[in-house]
């Protein structure tokens, strides 16, 4: 908590996201999620630290009470990813969010594929809900150009994943068919 306190003591910072590690990573599905959080999410959040678009998500997020009070009597919404939405609203309000690798929060991973798919479906659906902030992010003077690009790719990816997957599958299929016909 000392590292989080140091981050929150920085001027203009109202929230902090810590690194997340998976505690029960002895099973393959949990191990893969640990790689996702410890490597991929860590690299993304470290980059976001530089461009000013650190996101809040799940465990390991800390927000000052005074920061939450700035958002009114009900700072959290009914959004499925209320943590992500809170981070977006803080950015729009010009409140800094920082990421720290030094403080680590551990959590249990979902070890059943059905539960993992349900969890990730909820996350994607929540990102759809956060799409309503795209116009505000684009118009905001509080969000940097690189930060905006990061927000856009994050919020638009659920919308683009299926169509892009179909396009890639068609191109790959055509490539295979044409290569077989050419022999």
Describe the function of each predicted region:
Residues 27, 81, 85, 111-115:
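Charged, alpha-helix-enriched surfaces in structured cytosolic catalytic cores
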Residues 51, 111-183:
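Basic/Trp-rich segment in TM-proximal cytosolic loops or flexible interdomain/linker regions
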Residues 84-105:
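Catalytic donor-sugar/metal-binding loop of nucleotide-sugar-dependent glycosyltransferases
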Residues 25, 107-108:
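Generic structural signal for helix capping and beta-alpha/helix-loop junctions
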Residues 68, 105, 161-162:
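Short, solvent-exposed loop/turn segments at secondary-structure junctions
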Residues 18-19, 100, 154:
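Generic beta-strand/beta-sheet core signal
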Residues 70-71, 108, 116:
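Residues that scaffold the ATP/ADP-binding catalytic core of kinase and kinase-like folds
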Residues 3-79, 121-132:
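Long helical/loop segments within the catalytic core of UDP-sugar-dependent glycosyltransferases
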């Amino acid at each position: 908590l000392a590292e989080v306190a140091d981050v929150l003591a920085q001027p203009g910072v109202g929230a902090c996201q810590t690194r997340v590690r998976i505690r029960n990573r002895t099973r393959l599905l949990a191990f893969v999620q640990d790689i996702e959080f410890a490597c991929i999410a860590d690299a993304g959040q470290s980059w976001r630290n530089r461009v000013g678009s650190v996101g809040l998500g799940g465990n390991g997020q800390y927000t000052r009470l005074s920061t939450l009070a700035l958002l009114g009597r009900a700072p959290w919404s009914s959004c499925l990813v209320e943590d992500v939405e809170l981070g977006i609203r803080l950015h729009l309000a010009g409140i800094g969010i920082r990421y720290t690798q030094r403080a680590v929060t551990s959590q249990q991973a979902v070890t059943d594929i059905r539960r993992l798919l349900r969890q990730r479906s909820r996350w994607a659906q929540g990102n759809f809900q956060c799409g309503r902030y795209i116009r505000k992010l684009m118009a905001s003077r509080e969000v940097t150009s690189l930060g905006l690009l990061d927000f856009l790719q994050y919020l638009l990816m659920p919308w683009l994943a299926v169509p892009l997957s179909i396009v890639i599958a068609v191109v790959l299929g055509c490539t295979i068919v044409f290569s077989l016909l050419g022999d």
